[in-house]
């Protein structure tokens, strides 16, 4: 009887200590798809932690960075570039986990790649043949839609801003595919996941002209106003998400991501990205 009364009292006290957290992410796809994909993850975090996690999809990468800097969000899903630059600017930023995916060989991996692609009917078989064509990046803050493609161009001694007739920034990876399909552009930079989704949707109509080196997948971070202990508690919850969890299925269903959960790496896992910052064209060409 005493034990039951004690347990009941604990249940009554839980709401007093439960916290409400804001979890932000960037618009890599249409916001409605991102909300559908991440809502089960928010529900999982809320159920496992006893706290409430509310999802925010920012307008763009810049807004996400700004909100992390001003601590108006508690947790955030950030891309590789965001993480490296934010960590340099805010050393107290807490790294939690790295996103995992099933590769095309069905192995679980913390990496992905950037592709530069064209349509087969464009009859372009190499980057050099794409001179004076219309090209699209996604966003200057994108890892696979800008940073790593710029490394590819540097390796080929190509300045995209003078090599192509016109360069566009279409913000989202699926918008690059749409522009290719409508022949508004002849060549574009996208993530490998976007390419494989397009392959399933439109068939074998694309040619990969160049492939980047492996890129560390996105990270989840906690802002500086979250304690180290709390960060580790949430990281553990993320690490232990089952493979068959609704959150993983939602990523597959709404974004086409072959999600495999999360893993805790050393934050220096992302140091390889720093080489992209040394590409001359990367920061100097506007």
Language-model-detected regions and their locations in the chain:
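Extracytoplasmic small-molecule ligand-binding "clamshell" domains
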Residues: 19-89
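Acidic, polar ligand-binding/catalytic clefts
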Residues: 66-129
């Amino acid at each position: 009887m005493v034990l039951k009364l004690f347990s009941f009292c604990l249940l009554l006290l839980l709401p007093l200590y439960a916290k409400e957290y804001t979890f932000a992410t960037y618009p890599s796809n249409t916001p409605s798809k991102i909300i559908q994909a991440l809502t089960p993850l928010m529900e999982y975090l809320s159920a496992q932690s006893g706290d409430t996690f509310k999802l925010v999809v920012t307008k763009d990468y810049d807004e996400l960075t700004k909100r992390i800097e001003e601590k108006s969000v508690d947790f955030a899903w950030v891309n590789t570039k965001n993480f490296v630059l934010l960590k340099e600017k805010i050393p107290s930023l807490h790294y939690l986990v790295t996103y995992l995916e099933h590769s095309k060989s069905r192995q679980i991996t913390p990496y992905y790649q950037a592709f530069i692609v064209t349509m087969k009917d464009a009859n372009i078989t190499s980057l050099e043949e794409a001179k004076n064509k219309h090209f699209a990046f996604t966003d200057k803050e994108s890892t696979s839609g800008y940073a790593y493609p710029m490394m590819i161009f540097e390796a080929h001694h190509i300045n995209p801003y003078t090599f192509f007739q016109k360069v566009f920034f279409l913000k989202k990876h699926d918008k690059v595919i749409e522009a290719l399909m409508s022949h508004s552009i002849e060549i574009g930079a996208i993530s490998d996941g976007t390419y494989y989704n397009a392959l399933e949707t439109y068939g074998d109509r694309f040619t990969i002209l160049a492939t980047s080196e492996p890129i560390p997948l996105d990270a989840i971070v906690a802002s500086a106003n979250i304690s180290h202990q709390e960060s580790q508690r949430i990281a553990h919850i993320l690490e232990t998400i089952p493979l068959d969890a609704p959150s993983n299925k939602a990523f597959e269903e709404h974004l086409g991501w072959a999600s495999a959960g999360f893993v805790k790496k050393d934050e220096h896992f992302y140091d390889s990205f720093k080489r992209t910052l040394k590409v001359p064209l990367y920061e100097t060409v506007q």
